[in-house]
Amino acid sequence: MRSGSLAALVSLLLVAPLGAGLRGQGRGQDTRPGIAVLPFDNSGSYGQEKENFEALEKGIAGMMISELAANPQARVVEREQIEKLLAEQSLGASGKVTPETAAKIGKLVGARYVITGTFIDFYGDFRLDARIVNVETSEIVKVESDATQCEHLFDVIRNVATRLMKDANLPPLPKQAADQRLSRQVPTEALTFYSKALLYQDRGQRDKAVEMYQKALAVFPEYAEAQQGLQRVKPS
């Protein structure tokens, strides 16, 4: 009797790990490299009202997330999740985010890489610098930069995002998808309204956020990011 019970117990112990493994496979765990994008810092811009530059800190990050998320080989952390974490942890509140702080944030959201950066708009001359940080080592993997006139702001964001994909060892987009991304041109005016919508949204000023999303869509009706943002904040 004891012999039969022992055999049954051994069988159960052997089967249990297998069952757990199958359940893990069934859950379809996402093994793609995670990428988190933090708000970009204004490095001392001139030529527009201060709120526009404050908004761009969020808008550039939002558009960078969108460009990176177009690559199906990456798992990009949602902007709202990053904003909530920054508020809860008071991380980076004292100024520029250090590689060590970026790595800490990356670990909290399960990312392999964190992207931070700065921008400066000097009366229409625009420059963007982005750093990709390895979360495990806190080391800066690469710094990517681009500069142009402010009216081509979206081109700068897209160019830098494309290079960052390569730095993160992601394969390039399929040709058809890449051509579609390249054919899209987001006017700087629409991007500015979108950025201000994010600023008001994060402040809890829903009515103003709705107004800015609508203004962005009035300038560029095909603005998918503004359409999605409006759906999130507009009262049902």
Task: Show which residues each predicted segment covers.
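Catalytic-center loop of serine/cysteine hydrolases
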Residues: 83-191
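Short beta-strand->alpha-helix linker/helix-N-cap micro-motif
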Residues: 27-99, 114-123, 141-142
